[in-house]
Amino acid sequence: MSEVVVSKNINVSANDAWNKLSSFRGIEEFSPIAKSETTGSGAGAKRTCYMPDGAAIYETLNRVDEDAMEFEYEINKGPFPITRYVSTVKVEAVDNSNTKITWGCEFDSAPEAEAEMSQLFEGFYNVIIDSLEGVLQN
């Protein structure tokens, strides 16, 4: 099992960040995902994310804790050389206009793919958090 965690402070309100992230919809607005489709809402919702090359990532929203501003999702199927991926996203208010986003995952992969996947996920989380800040500030 491998773990990747990225924590960053952004200059937006926690409520705005939480509302955008926890909907499990529209991730293409603030990520490298080209298009996404979500069915259902709350725990059990399914999302299909399409990469720019057309590859699809199939995800399930496992848990949403509104009070703690935290949710968990998993990748059920995708183009990555992993056998398990579970991610947790947490939103914490620093003050009225600053928020700490923590996005992390645990995944299983072949040893030769571990470093590449860790680097990929870390880069992806950094891009998402930075882009989220830009989208919410405009």
Please identify what each model-predicted range represents.
Residues 31-51, 123-126:
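Short N-terminal helix-initiation segments at or just after the protein's N-terminus
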Residues 100, 106-138:
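A conserved amphipathic terminal alpha-helix motif
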Residues 29, 38, 52-98, 106-109, ...:
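Hydrophobic-ligand binding "helix-grip"
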Residues 1-42:
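Hydrophobic ligand-binding cavity/cleft-lining segments
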Residues 3, 49, 113:
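Catalytic cores of transferase enzymes with a strong primary signal for eukaryotic protein kinases
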